[in-house]
Amino acid sequence: YNTFDAHDSLLLKLSPACPACAKPVPAPEKGAALNEVRAANPVAVKLAEPNVMVLDMARYSLDNEPWHEREEILRADDDVRARLGWKLRSEHFAQPWVTAGVDFGDAKHTLALAFDIVSRVAVSGAKLALEDSEYASITFDGKAVPTEVDGWYVDKCLDTVALPDFEAGAHELIVTYDYRRTVNPEWMYLIGDFGVYSCGSHSELTEPVRTLYY
């Protein structure tokens, strides 16, 4: 088999097989089972990496205006850009690195994204993964969180920032961007040792996953 990363490709040239190569390959002999697991019983599992809750829906506010209703982040970004007279990211435009360092002479703006996080359990050691962290400030339950990058998640453009421990209940995470047309708010990710229950667009943090059923 072959492993492909994003945007990888493989070109194959096929040639007619010789008669000897066309013979069927005998199937391997059946070996003994390595382990036997009853499908009805829970199986202990250990996650290879932290679990994740996707933060793709947020209330949003441009320049401290009243909060808009919860919306998918890219759609919220389109709404704000349309009001500012900027090109929408859903349209065709140059990739961000093409305009890196370009001064468009825009007025200064802020764009705040508020996430309502509901947890059924106490959580410690959680992190927030986000893009453009150098333009962001973070608060959790009204208290400032140092935007100190301590690693990355999945892709090096997704910086991770440690969040404070929190108890079971409802919490508010607000990410405020120094907003300009070259800053591109994207989905964020809450990662840590917890489970996630999802129903439609609503998710809650639950007990960490320790067992699974087949």
Residues of each region from the PLM?
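Solvent-exposed beta-strand/loop surfaces of large extracellular or lumenal domains
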Residues: 1, 138-160
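C-terminal beta-strand-rich structural cap/linker in extracellular carbohydrate-active enzymes
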Residues: 2-24
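Short strand-edge motifs at loop-to-beta-strand transitions and within beta-strands
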Residues: 10, 109-113, 157-161
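Short, hydrophobic/aromatic-enriched beta-strand segments in well-ordered soluble domains
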Residues: 12-17, 113-115, 172-179
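An acidic-aromatic loop/edge-strand motif
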Residues: 23-106, 132, 151-156, 161-214
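Non-catalytic, beta-strand-enriched accessory regions in extracellular/secretory proteins
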Residues: 102-118
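Aromatic-lined ligand-binding clefts that engage carbohydrates, nucleic acids, or primary amines
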Residues: 115-140, 173
